[in-house]
Regions:
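Register position in tetratricopeptide repeats
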Residues: 36, 70-71, 104-105, 138-139, ...
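Helix-start (N-cap) detector for alpha-helical repeat units in TPR-like alpha-solenoids
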Residues: 24-25, 58-59, 92-93, 126-127, ...
Length: 352
């Protein structure tokens, strides 16, 4: 619906509400129109007004809970969902939404409890099984995750998200051929999805099919999606095939597309360090730090590069910076102690 038409309907509805201020259905219609416009403040305002006159309206309570959920205020979200649940304890959607809140809080057992209650009330809803699968996936229990994705797909075989997520789980389980089949099925359903093309290319990379992998990366580049991410994944694949010249060019292209993100600088620096271009890698780590100055990992890698370049003093300084940002990182402290020992020995050697 065009915005002009929506505004016209809003005006007509507001006029009706002036005559019938206690007509609950008008409030719901108005909130849906504002939702269609993406005006979430207005949606919240309308639902609050509705709850003033009908405090036990479950639809409004769930709506408020969902709005606060997307605002990432999960406590307020849960408050509204719980109130809705006391009024209607047989609504599967409320249990599902509460499960989502606990999933965001990484409370596995409570999230699973509420998702299972939702299934008790509606066992034919694929999204609930998908949510449980994601829960297990986040817990790195890929076998259970796979089982729930398969259940979700038995209900809705063309659910693109379930197919992609199942493909990713199969990838984690080293079932690369199965993952590839799933990703290709998704690509038939969503041929304009650049990230699906990348998933296919990544699977082909692991399966050592360079020509096909590169063909899908090239296809992804034509889809005009997240080109920065595509170039980075393409570069990683090129590195796997030991085509370091191509990998470097692809990282440089990613940097050209978004010079304010640190990932490509970091990965290119790692590539340069791994191919004995130490001084260039040092420069690239420094560029990454200009973009993201408080990254302890970058300082640690810079320290390693300086150490390989026999510049012990600069290595010490870089590791100190890493420790100052991440003081609880034992690995940084251990490496720093070894580098510091070398530094002390080198100073002693100069003084002898």
């Amino acid at each position: 619906m065009e915005n002009i038409e929506i505004n016209k309907k809003i005006g007509e509805l507001v006029a009706k509400m002036a005559k019938e201020p206690n007509n609950i259905e008008y409030y719901h219609e108005l909130s849906e129109l504002y939702l269609e416009q993406g005006n979430y403040e207005k949606v919240m305002s309308v639902l609050k007004s509705l709850l003033d006159i009908a405090p036990e309206d479950v639809r409004a309570l769930v709506g408020m809970g969902t709005l606060w959920f997307y605002e990432r205020d999960f406590r307020k979200s849960l408050e509204y969902y719980n109130k809705a649940l006391t009024i209607n304890p047989k609504n599967f959607l409320i249990y599902y939404n509460i499960g989502n809140v606990y999933a965001e809080w990484k409370n596995f057992s409570k999230a699973l409890f509420y998702y299972n209650r939702a299934i008790d009330l509606n066992s034919a809803n694929s999204e609930i099984y998908n949510a449980i699968a994601l829960l297990y996936q986040d817990n790195e229990d890929y076998v259970e995750a796979k089982a729930y994705y398969e259940k979700a797909l038995s209900i809705n075989p063309e659910n693109v998200n379930s197919l992609i997520d199942l493909g990713n789980v199969c990838f984690k389980l080293y079932e690369y051929e199965t993952a590839l089949k799933l990703f290709k099925k998704v690509f038939v359903l969503a041929p304009d999805n650049d990230m699906v093309a990348v998933c296919i290319a990544n699977a082909l990379t692991v399966m050592k099919d360079r020509a096909q992998a590169f063909a899908y990366f090239e296809k992804a580049l034509t889809l005009k999606g997240d080109l920065y991410r595509v170039y980075i994944c393409y570069a990683i694949s090129a590195t796997e095939f030991k085509d370091y010249k191509l990998a470097r060019a692809l990282y440089e292209k990613a940097i050209e597309i978004n010079p304010k993100k640190a990932d490509a600088y970091m990965l290119l620096a790692n590539l340069l360090a791994g191919t004995d271009n130490i001084k260039e890698s040092i420069d690239m780590y420094k560029q990454a730090l200009r973009v993201e100055p408080n990254n302890s990992q970058t300082y640690a890698l810079l320290g390693s590069a300086h150490y390989l370049d026999n510049d012990i003093e600069q290595a010490v300084a870089a590791y100190r910076a890493a420790i100052s940002i991440s003081p609880d990182n034992d690995e940084y402290r251990l490496i720093y102690s070894h580098v510091m020992e070398d530094y002390v020995n080198s100073v002693r050697g100069q003084n002898d």
